[in-house]
């Protein structure tokens, strides 16, 4: 048996702060705990017959250790327990290979360590107590130190990764012919198939008619393919409500909305995503995506793609993993639209129960509520689910630009408890596709069936059926665990590149059809792909991550990061070359047959004769052999008989002396209302360079934007907008009103981006409801009817969506239902992505005037509002969109004012009511307000806290009369409420109702209240001292001051530059994700830009002799599993071809390089920057030993990924790319998890600074270098943000200037920067081009 080698690593630097967080968490439960120490253990499966030789051991030690610390890796543990110590080791369950292992193995392969085939990382803790620890203390410690769903305790070091050596035998066929339905009932129970009584009868009868018994695999397959999750029986079924048969199914009703909207859908209800008619745009693409080649500018018609789905059950069981795979699955839905689409950006939403944050009292949360052991607690969901979705997007390279977060746990007047025990994890995605790739081609006999993506693992077996269980918790916990998946964004990124290579293929896209793998695994996706022609599939042709998988697991596992496609045999070579270049597996698993059947052949068990002497081969088994029409064809409608169950209503009873200020003390802290900074700061909001509007606005980057806007190309101001609407708490009172409000909220958010026309707006409708429990199915039907009616009145339509109809969980003997929820994602084409208005007030000092346009004028209903929830009630009558025509008129007028640039800011009235809307605009603008709301005869509380839909606008004084007249002439009310006040820390909010002052308080104090819940959550997910520093800073800050010195050069590129155009290689590695925006920046500056991969360099496919520049791009090479850019550095250092090529390039005096983010981390590891300037820099020698760097980029001091619109100051120095920019103070995107500049010694740092080799510093609001968080997002000493070589040719930066070369990419532009003709950051790239033209080069 091959050995498992152990490498123990002690933490160094501030990463040891993790021990402090563990200590704080444990000491609450274990007061005698004295200290916590940690170490990591890399458990390496060494598959060679002999142990590593000396050179291989050196490589392993370098990979696992810290380059700045000698002897921090050992093969014996550093931590040894004493008599009062507990030594605990925890790590991943071994039934699957983790994504971290996959990436570490890839790094080892790149370093030439071919014998490494699995590496799992465990964490070891030494807990020291005052006395000898008890077994109970050990149990408490273990529970706190690991996630029992995905991890386990290791009492002893791992000795083997192989639980068994051969596939587990399959059970025999299900004997329906002899036993009838009971045989199927038994299989249903044992396999967790979630078949209901109708299913059991139907399949028993079908197999009796066929006169054969189904195999175990076939029964499993049918359960997944025909589960509620996959078939949507309820929405397509025949519904009877209170004895009355509905004329149409819900699905038919939803489709009918298309009749009242413009016919601009190019895809609807028929593909992995929907799509609407786009615009012609110019864009860059490589000349040949299978080899290194030059980017060329092209033009074509690009459509807008949108999809949305939820991943609720897996997220409830294992929040981080469930959310990663929910995000990954939705990304694949975008990828697989038509014959391949471009992923652009995502949206995210979370609904969870009462948080019960330790030592933070939210008085509406009932402390007596119990929670089940088989679901994660709401607090864990809020933090870990958002961590999972954020981490996946960050590593894949998809920005998240909009979302929602909502909490509810409430006892209704009838005694029922409603709470999101089973949470909602919502993921939406917007993308683009070429018009010529809209239609999938039908399968034809002889076509190749191909799986692209990760290998098969025993992951997510039965997820489609498991998520369809009527009440979660009725399945066994083992089966629930088996249905949870794990995400590998690195693999998905590689797979995305293969699909993009096909989409951009010079000879035309070879993909004929494409589908993503999700619920039901291979069984579902390969049937869908081959329908109706049929296919034969061979188990031996799949790449297995685990050789012990049996046929059922190969066929049914929902392992992630896998797509299936069809192509003609003549295109096989193209796909093989593209996948090899991107290092992504592509398995040709079968062919289209034309016999209308799906057949799985388990040919792994086909032996060549028993004696090996040429006996006739055994017939391989066929675990699946089904008629496709029988499985996928039109099935009989299921019938559902539903009864309405009117809610028990109770008038809202607020404390009699409740003041507006006291109400705000609660409402501003409710998660649905409060700041979402804890979500936005940890997710990349700029990657890809196509983001025109993300969540954060104003000088303090407050997360309040109503709409997300993206470009269809870097080179155009044409794009798309999307906005969300959801009001589930109101559904507990009136499902119809809740549906109307969801639609209206999506549109009052979308209205602040300029779109082509209201009737062009299309929507994804996602339904999360416990529809099969008493009263809930009828409530959903009512909500659907209301949504259809209001959309017809508005002229918008649904073109896609998903449903999740088992939104209930068992808590003891009680069934706890979640509120019925409809999430509307509206999207449309933007003819001008720069014509967007944000909520932040922009004209302080009385120059901004505030107008209010109520859409249900005269109404002030409080039912289901944030105010009611904050007093543990619902009330009776919810807000509503009484007059849809008001919204139509308001939408058109607001859009016209956007075109005319007459609106300065705008925000919709929603959760928290009018007072929250006004205060949020003040918070975002860091600006005071003075307003008076006229509402004669109405008490201040309903006036201010009712959530009736409406708009609040800021206009300048000269436009007040004209804007009011526009709305009022259309029959709408438009009230002038007041004006802005002073800006900065002294800003005051003075709010009156009917001339009586109800709020008079500093904006900063109210904002601190609104931010408090977010900061409490942040304290649990980031380094507390950083959180406290940011909290304090918000109270004192005025906002950044940008500066361009008079000597700053005017950015200009000759249209036809003389002489040869200089070449720059955009160099990327596995996991890089910042290459396209980097290519755009250099192209804009006049370079000939080439797409080059590390695989190209390592294979000798290209040489760098003709290139003047190399850009090392941002991202997560190898997911940064062994430290930032460590894997990339290993590939450069240990591959002779790459080492020689880059070494020769560096030695040439006529070359330059730019390393950004991951590229910056790489240049530091390679020693291109950060080395001792007084010593001649050595390069890796022929013995391929790594350079000893002087600088290492370590984890941010906050302990998490940081996404910020930060400020930097450009310093004098030799950096050629920053010439003429010295003295500038500029904003720039920053997005990284490991940006802390750790020098080998303070002396080295001082030398580097003295030589002027630090050309960029993080700057405070006064433009001075800073270490203050988050102005310095990573905590680097002295505020260092960039570093260059002595000769200035090599520049390494942690921020992303390539994401800010176009002004529409900027997150905030104060005057006078709002009228600049070009972005100052373009000059950085122009400087590089100008340098290449100098005679000295």
UniProtKB/Swiss-Prot annotation:
Localisation per UniProt entry: Cytoplasm
Catalyzed chemical reaction(s): N(2)-formyl-N(1)-(5-phospho-beta-D-ribosyl)glycinamide + L-glutamine + ATP + H2O = 2-formamido-N(1)-(5-O-phospho-beta-D-ribosyl)acetamidine + L-glutamate + ADP + phosphate + H(+)
Annotated GO MF terms: ATP binding; metal ion binding; phosphoribosylformylglycinamidine synthase activity
Pathways per UniProt: Purine metabolism; IMP biosynthesis via de novo pathway; 5-amino-1-(5-phospho-D-ribosyl)imidazole from N(2)-formyl-N(1)-(5-phospho-D-ribosyl)glycinamide: step 1/2
Modified residues (Phosphoserine): 215
Enzyme active site: 1157 (nucleophile), 1296, 1298
Annotated GO biological process: 'de novo' AMP biosynthetic process; 'de novo' IMP biosynthetic process; 'de novo' XMP biosynthetic process; anterior head development; glutamine metabolic process; GMP biosynthetic process; response to xenobiotic stimulus
Keyword Membrane attributed: no
Annotated residues for binding of ATP: 322-333, 402-404, 705, 910
InterPro entries the record matches: Class_I_gatase-like, FGAR-AT_N, FGAR-AT_PurM_N-like, PurL_large, PurL_linker, PurM-like_C_dom, PurM-like_C_sf, PurM-like_N_sf
UniProt domain Glutamine amidotransferase type-1: residue ranges: 1063-1301
Function per UniProt: Phosphoribosylformylglycinamidine synthase involved in the purines biosynthetic pathway. Catalyzes the ATP-dependent conversion of formylglycinamide ribonucleotide (FGAR) and glutamine to yield formylglycinamidine ribonucleotide (FGAM) and glutamate.
Protein family membership: In the N-terminal section; belongs to the FGAMS family.
Protein name (database record): Phosphoribosylformylglycinamidine synthase
Organism: Mus musculus
Lineage: Eukaryota, Metazoa, Chordata, Craniata, Vertebrata
């Amino acid at each position: 048996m091959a050995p498992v080698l152990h490498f123990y690593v002690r933490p160094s630097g501030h990463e040891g702060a993790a021990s402090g967080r563990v200590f704080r968490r444990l000491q609450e439960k274990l007061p005698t705990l004295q200290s916590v120490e940690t170490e990591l253990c890399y458990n390496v499966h060494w598959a060679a017959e002999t142990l590593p030789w000396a050179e291989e051991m050196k490589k392993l030690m370098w990979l696992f250790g810290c380059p700045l610390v000698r002897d921090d890796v050992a093969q014996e543990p550093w931590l040894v327990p004493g008599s009062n110590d507990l030594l605990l080791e925890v790590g991943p369950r071994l039934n699957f290979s983790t994504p971290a292992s996959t990436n570490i193995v890839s790094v080892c392969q790149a370093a030439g360590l071919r014998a490494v085939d699995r590496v799992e990382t465990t964490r070891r803790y030494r807990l020291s107590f005052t006395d000898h620890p008890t077994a109970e203390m050990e149990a408490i410690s273990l529970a706190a130190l690991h996630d029992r769903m995905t991890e386990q305790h290791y009492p002893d070091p791992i000795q083997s990764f192989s639980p068994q050596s051969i596939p587990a035998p399959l059970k025999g066929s299900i004997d329906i012919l002899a036993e009838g339905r009971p045989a199927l009932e038994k299989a249903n129970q044992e396999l967790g198939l979630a078949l209901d009584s109708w299913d059991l009868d139907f399949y028993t009868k079908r197999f009796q008619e066929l006169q054969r018994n189904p195999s175990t695999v076939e029964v499993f397959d049918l359960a997944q393919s025909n589960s509620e999750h996959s078939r949507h029986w309820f929405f397509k079924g025949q519904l009877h409500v209170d004895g009355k048969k509905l004329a149409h199914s819900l699905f038919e009703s939803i489709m009918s909305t298309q009749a009242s909207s413009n016919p601009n859908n190019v895809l609807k209800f028929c593909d992995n995503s929907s799509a609407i008619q786009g615009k012609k745009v110019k864009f860059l693409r490589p000349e040949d995506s299978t080899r290194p080649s030059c980017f060329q500018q092209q033009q074509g018609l690009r459509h807008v793609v949108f999809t949305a789905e939820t991943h609720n059950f897996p997220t409830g069981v294992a929040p981080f993993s469930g959310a990663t795979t929910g995000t990954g699955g939705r990304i694949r839905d975008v990828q697989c639209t038509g014959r391949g689409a471009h992923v652009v950006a995502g949206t995210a939403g979370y609904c969870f129960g009462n948080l019960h944050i330790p030592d933070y009292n939210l008085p509406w949360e009932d402390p007596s509520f119990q929670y089940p052991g088989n679901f994660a607690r709401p607090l864990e969901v809020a933090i870990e689910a958002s961590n999972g979705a954020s981490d996946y997007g960050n590593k894949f390279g998809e920005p998240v630009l909009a979302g929602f977060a909502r909490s509810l746990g409430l006892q209704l007047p009838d005694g029922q408890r409603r709470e999101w025990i089973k949470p909602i994890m919502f993921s939406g995605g917007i993308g683009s596709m070429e018009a010529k790739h809209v239609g999938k081609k039908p399968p034809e006999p002889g076509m190749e069936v191909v799986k692209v993506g990760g290998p098969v693992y025993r992951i997510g077996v039965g997820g489609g059926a498991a998520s369809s269980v009527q009440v979660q918790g009725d399945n066994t916990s083992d089966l629930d665990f088996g249905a949870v998946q794990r995400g590998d964004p690195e693999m998905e990124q590689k797979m995305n590149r293969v699909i993009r290579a096909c989409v951009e293929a010079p000879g035309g896209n070879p993909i004929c059809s494409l589908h993503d793998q999700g619920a039901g695994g291979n069984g579902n996706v390969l049937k869908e792909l081959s329908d109706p022609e049929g296919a034969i599939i061979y188990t031996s042709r799949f790449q297995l991550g685990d050789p012990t998988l049996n046929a059922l697991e190969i066929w049914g596992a929902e392992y992630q990061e896998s797509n299936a496609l069809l192509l003609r045999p003549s295109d096989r070579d193209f796909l093989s070359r593209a996948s090899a270049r991107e290092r992504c597996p592509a398995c040709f698993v079968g062919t289209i047959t034309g016999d209308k059947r799906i057949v799985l052949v388990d040919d792994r068990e086909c032996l060549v004769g028993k004696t090996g002497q040429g006996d006739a081969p055994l017939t391989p088994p066929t675990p699946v052999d089904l008629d496709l029409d029988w499985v996928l064809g039109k099935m009989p409608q299921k019938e559902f008989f539903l009864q309405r169950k009117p809610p028990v209503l109770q008038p809202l009873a607020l404390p009699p002396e409740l003041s507006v200020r006291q109400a705000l003390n609660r409402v501003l802290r409710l998660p649905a209302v409060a700041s979402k900074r804890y979500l936005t700061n940890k997710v990349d909001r700029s990657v890809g360079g196509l983001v025109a509007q993300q969540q954060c606005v104003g000088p303090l980057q407050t997360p309040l934007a109503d709409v997300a806007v993206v470009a269809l190309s870097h080179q155009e101001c044409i794009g798309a907008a999307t906005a969300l609407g959801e009001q589930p708490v109101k559904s507990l009172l009136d499902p119809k009103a809740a549906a109307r409000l969801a639609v209206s909220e999506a549109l009052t958010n979308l209205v602040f981006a300029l779109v082509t026309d209201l009737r062009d707006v299309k929507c994804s409708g996602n339904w999360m409801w416990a529809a099969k429990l008493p009263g809930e199915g009828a409530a959903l039907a009512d909500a659907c009817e209301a949504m259809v009616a209001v959309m017809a009145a508005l002229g918008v339509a649904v073109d896609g969506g998903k449903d999740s109809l088992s939104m209930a969980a068992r808590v003891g003997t009680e069934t706890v239902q979640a509120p019925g929820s409809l999430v509307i994602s509206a999207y449309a084409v933007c003819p001008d992505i720069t014509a967007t208005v944000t909520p932040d007030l922009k004209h302080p000092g009385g120059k901004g005037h505030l107008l209010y346009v109520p859409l249900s004028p005269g109404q002030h209903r409080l039912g289901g509002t944030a105010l009611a929830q904050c007093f543990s009630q619902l009330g009776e009558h919810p807000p509503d969109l009484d007059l849809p025509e008001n919204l139509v008129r308001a939408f058109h007028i607001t859009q016209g004012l956007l075109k005319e640039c007459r609106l300065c800011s705008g925000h919709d009235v929603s959760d928290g009511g009018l007072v929250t809307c006004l205060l949020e605009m003040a918070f975002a603008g860091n600006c005071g307000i003075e307003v008076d709301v006229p509402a004669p005869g109405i008490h201040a509380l309903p006036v201010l806290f009712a959530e009736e839909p409406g708009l609040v606008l800021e206009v300048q004084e000269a436009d007040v009369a004209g804007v009011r007249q526009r709305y009022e002439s259309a029959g709408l009310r438009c009230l002038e409420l007041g004006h802005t006040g002073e800006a900065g820390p002294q800003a005051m909010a003075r709010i009156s109702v009917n001339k009586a002052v109800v709020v008079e308080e500093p904006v900063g104090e109210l904002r601190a209240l609104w931010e408090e819940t977010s900061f409490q959550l942040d304290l649990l997910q980031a380094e507390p001292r950083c959180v406290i520093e940011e909290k304090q800073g918000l109270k004192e800050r005025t906002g950044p001051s940008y500066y361009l010195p008079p000597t700053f050069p005017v950015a200009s590129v000759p249209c036809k530059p003389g002489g040869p155009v200089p070449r720059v290689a955009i160099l990327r590695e596995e996991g890089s994700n910042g290459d396209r925006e980097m290519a755009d920046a250099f192209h804009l500056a006049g370079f000939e830009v080439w797409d080059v991969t590390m695989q190209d360099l390592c294979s000798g496919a290209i040489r760098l002799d003709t290139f003047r520049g190399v850009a090392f791009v941002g991202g997560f090479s190898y997911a940064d599993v062994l430290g930032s850019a460590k894997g990339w550095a290993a590939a450069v250092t240990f591959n002779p071809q790459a080492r020689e090529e880059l070494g020769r390039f560096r030695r040439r005096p006529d070359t330059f390089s730019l390393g950004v983010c991951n590229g910056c981390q790489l240049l530091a590891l390679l020693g291109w920057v950060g080395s001792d300037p007084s010593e001649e820099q050595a390069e890796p020698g022929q013995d391929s030993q790594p350079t000893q760097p002087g600088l290492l980029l370590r984890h941010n001091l906050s302990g998490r990924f940081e996404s910020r619109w930060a400020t930097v100051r450009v310093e004098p120095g030799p950096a050629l790319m920053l010439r003429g920019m010295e003295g500038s103070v500029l904003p720039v995107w920053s997005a990284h998890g490991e940006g802390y500049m750790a020098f080998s010694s303070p002396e080295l740092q001082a030398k580097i600074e003295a030589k002027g080799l630090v050309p960029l510093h993080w700057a405070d609001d006064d433009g001075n270098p800073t270490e203050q968080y988050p102005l310095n997002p990573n905590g680097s000493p002295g505020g260092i943000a960039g570093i260059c070589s002595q000769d200035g040719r090599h520049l390494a930066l942690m921020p992303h200037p390539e994401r800010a070369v176009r002004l529409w990419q900027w997150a905030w532009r104060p005057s006078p920067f709002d009228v600049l003709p070009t972005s100052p950051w373009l000059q950085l790239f122009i400087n590089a081009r100008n340098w290449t033209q100098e005679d000295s080069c």
